[in-house]
Amino acid sequence: MKKTFFPAHLIGTVSAPASKSEAHRRMICAGLTQGETMLTGFMDSADMAATMRCLGALGSTFNRDGDTLTISGMQGKIAKMPVMDCGESGSTLRFFVPIALTVAGGTVFRMHGRLGSRPMDVYRDLFVPRGVRWYMGVGADGAAELTVRGKMEPGDYVLPGNVSSQFVSGLLFALPLLPGNSTLTVQQPVESESYIRMTIEAIAASGIEVQESSAFSWRIPGHQQYRSRSCHLNGDYSQAAVLCCAGALGHDITVTHLSPVTTQGDRAILRHLMALGATVEESDNHIRVKAGKLHGATLDMHDCPDIAPILALTAQLAEGESRLTHCGRLRLKECDRLAATVEILNLLGGNAQADGDDIVLHGVKQLRGGVTLPNYGDHRMVMLASIAATKCEQPIEMDGIEAIDKSWPEYLKVYQMLGGKCE
């Protein structure tokens, strides 16, 4: 699907969608119980559907009533080698590999888009020496497939810290279910620490005990059971970051449903925007970011890589030079987001470059626009383009807009409600 985005002024109040990261985790905890759990504030997306399919393959059932999702946990016997379609969701795939080895003795994971090429060697290197059979192949329809067979056993597990935190979270979900005690150690320095803390928070809320013996080293008792714990899902700072950056660029947007008490690392968006010179007003779970005299800054993305593209746009329109550091993980997303961000900004008339794992931006006063952007197949690039267009002299065109369905299907409606123009 192709859309044209036009220069515009955005104004209004928006409720942040439910945190996708929290929803993944709470759904999995609910699915691993044998009871019923209600999650309110739930929002559909392609990634949520992927996690629901995988839980369904393990026997969970779902009922939707408005924004309330009721999950009935695993019931009855699990099919031998169930098939789990992960769509393009890296979180879903990496969370469920240890879970499937624990409760099903293996499975066939189906992967679409770039997911089949995203790194999985961390698990392969961890599990194959422990007797798990691991096979990457291609299904009859051309989709990538990963087949794993075997059982996880209690023991001492060590992961490097410079890999996706999703691998750590997958083990944290599964290890408490094993018939014996285990330890999990993540070697420092650790990437995306906040996401690990979010997983520990979610499993603890479901009655799982994890004992931190030292920094990034946990003792995890076995024979544990997940307990039902209904909750209201918090707003998503990762998605809200797009609107907060729009505010820093001169639009007048208030975002609600954002708790100041959160393990979401992407709350760093507020700190980073203030470092660029924006003003942040926060009260009663409402956030309003106002434009100041934006200036260059050095911003560390190691714990919040998902907000780097939209921050790069904001820094591109600030005076002076900015540098976004530790952006290497962007290369391993739905597209190479580091390269795509630099390419988009330069096509629009900016001055950006990749310097190793950093993005360097030389500020410009105005973006030109007037171009057709490639189809990146990435929801973050769609949101980046839509906000960039509001600050361009001429409209911009982009193909592959349907990628937005992966995380925020209602985004374009929200964008237009705020005054954004696209057709």
Q: Could you say what each language-model-derived stretch is?
A:
Residues 1-423:
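Short, structured segments at the rim of ligand-binding sites
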